[in-house]
Amino acid sequence: MSTKTNSTKATSEKTDSLKTNRGTKSSAGYSEQNTPLGGCILADTPITFNENKPVTKVKVRNTGDRPIQVGSHFHFFEANRALEFDRAAAYGKRLNISSTTAIRFEPGDETEVPLIPFGGKQTLYGFNNLVDGWTGEGVVPNSERPDKLEAIRRAAERGFKSSK
């Protein structure tokens, strides 16, 4: 019985020492030494993202009868056909919002959204298969065949609404 008590006491002392020997709080909050397990250490200044990318603003109207949600990394040009906006201006762009988030468009609502160009190789596949290739601007990389006009034609042919 005393062994069990000693073992429990030793464990308790170990836990207490972990709690008390973690350092002191800095003026900004917790330091790495005293942050509770699972806690976060935040920077003194806000984290910014996409600050060096050109922003294109487009007005979007949901002409459908149901809410439509578009995620942060969806090729906005290929978004739901009931959304009416300047699709040509949205070619090769995504929403300028945090990763893993989305914007919801209620039926009949009209709102302006910020778009930024995709990063990396700017080659997009899937979505609604309107593009399936390079969407960048400027010098065309080897083996890429940009065809923005063809993608715009396909979108109109398949009933994707556009304001222009």
Curated annotation (Swiss-Prot):
Cell location: Cytoplasm
Biased composition (Polar residues): 1-10, 20-32
Pathway of action: Nitrogen metabolism; urea degradation; CO(2) and NH(3) from urea (urease route): step 1/1
Coiled-coil residue spans: none
Spans annotated as Disordered: 1-32
Pfam families attached to this UniProt entry: Urease_beta
GO terms for MF: urease activity
EC number per UniProt: 3.5.1.5
InterPro entries with a match to the protein in the record: Urease_beta-like, Urease_betasu_sf, Urease_subunit
GO BP terms, alphabetized: urea catabolic process
Main location: cytoplasm
Keyword GTP-binding found: no
CDD domains the UniProt entry points to: Urease_beta
NCBIfam families linked to this entry: PRK13203.1 (NF009682), urease_beta (TIGR00192)
Quaternary structure annotation from Swiss-Prot or TrEMBL: Heterotrimer of UreA (gamma), UreB (beta) and UreC (alpha) subunits. Three heterotrimers associate to form the active enzyme.
Family: Belongs to the urease beta subunit family.
Record-given protein name: Urease subunit beta
Top-level taxonomy: Bacteria, Pseudomonadati, Pseudomonadota, Gammaproteobacteria, Enterobacterales
